[in-house]
Structure formats: C-alpha cells, structure tokens
A protein has these predicted regions:
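N-terminal pro-sequences and low-complexity stem/linker regions of secreted or lumenal proteins
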Residues: 1-173
C-alpha cells in the first residue's frame, strides 16, 4: 500500500481525478482469491493503483466524514459492483435473464473456468500483471446460468447506451 498524495512519491493532489477500478462479479472473486485477498492488482486494468490511498485528513470535511460516513463499512451481500449489490440489498435476490442464450443478450454471457468463479483467459492474455491487464474470453454481464451479475442498461432511455441512429429515441441501441 502507498499514499497517492505522498510528496515523496507520486504527489498527486486530492483534486486530481484517478480512474475507476474494476467492480465486477467474477473479477471480485478472483481478486479475493479464496480469502487470501492477494489478487487485486492481478485482476484489474488499473494496475497497482488498487493499492493506493489518500491522506483524507487534509480534506476540509474530514472531521464530519470520520463521524458520519460509512466508507468501508458497506458490507456487500454479493460479489461485484453496485448493480448487483443494490438489488441484493433490497431483495436478497439476483436478477435473472431467462433464455439469455437465445436472446440478443447471448454475447454478454460470461465464459468461466470449470471452477465456476473465475473467468476464462484468452490464449494471448499476459502471464503477469506487470505485462498488462488480463484478457478474458468473455467478461459478460450474465453468468452461464443467466443471472445478471454486472451492470446492465435498460432497453429504453435514459440509458448509457445511446439510441440507435435513425431509430426510436425512446430506446437504447
């Protein structure tokens, strides 16, 4: 672990935006590595940034945040990012996409290893995190048994998916 804002290190200001980390169902399990918690750098595309932290005490609202912010005390009920965890928080269930293998969502079905918890790597995936981020056969939003475990966009607007060119503006492409 290292301080991102350490004057003797990277010295990145608190105002400098950094990239987001991978918050996905299978990668989260691969990062946790059976409870060893030693693969966070290996299964991300952010490299060692996952090991960095800021000295939050320099923030003007630090005293308030220390007392009233949950921060790391959100105990997620499911692996991965906020999509699945928000749904799980409300209903303790995982959304399903019935018959996904015969639907337009078929390309978003993840390809996993026989262990069922790790994504299958391509033949040209780097052997080490030092050589680059892993490459997956299919890092999909759906499990092979059609559970929706990563962020999916609605088929209508508003959506992160823009409408199809020349199509109905009420729908996503």
């Amino acid at each position: 672990p290292f301080a991102i804002d350490d004057p003797n290190g990277f010295n990145a200001s608190l105002s400098v935006p950094t990239r987001d980390f991978v918050h996905r169902f299978y990668q989260n399990q691969m990062q946790i590595d059976g409870g060893r918690n030693d693969k966070f750098v290996a299964y991300t595309d952010a490299g060692a940034l996952t090991m960095g932290h800021y000295d939050g005490s320099k923030l003007p609202m630090w005293p308030i945040a220390r007392e009233f912010t949950l921060a790391d005390h959100f105990f997620m009920g499911a692996f991965g990012g906020s999509f699945l965890n928000h749904i799980y928080l409300i209903c303790a269930c995982i959304p399903q996409y019935p018959h996904a293998d015969t639907s337009p969502a078929k390309p978003t079905i993840a390809v996993v290893n026989p262990d069922g918890v790790s994504l299958a790597l391509t033949d040209n995936s780097p052997a080490s995190a030092i050589d680059g981020p892993p490459k997956y056969v299919s890092d999909g939003n759906l499990t092979p048994d059609f559970y929706a475990v990563n962020t999916m966009q609605p088929p209508y607007q508003p959506s992160q998916n823009a409408p199809a060119p020349g199509g109905d503006p009420a729908y996503s492409d």
